[in-house]
Amino acid sequence: MRPIIEFCLSNLASGSHDAMEELEKDPNLDIIEYGCLNHCGTCALDHFALVNGEYIAGDTPEELVSNIYKYLEENPMF
């Protein structure tokens, strides 16, 4: 089972698209786009994704990618 990374379309339009494109290169991740993930207050402030249901954010797309991999390293699925 691979980690699931969920992105909000509104947040992608705000700059997280670069993070999603980088993560899509990793065959060990499942990337899913949704219209809304119901994090509207923080969506307007940060780049974010849900990683296995956990909210992960970053000030930049690069920081978001780094924080996602850090979370996955600290919280292995097996």
Swiss-Prot record:
Cited HAMAP family: UPF0349
Protein family per UniProt: Belongs to the UPF0349 family.
Protein name: UPF0349 protein ABC2936
Organism: Shouchella clausii (strain KSM-K16)
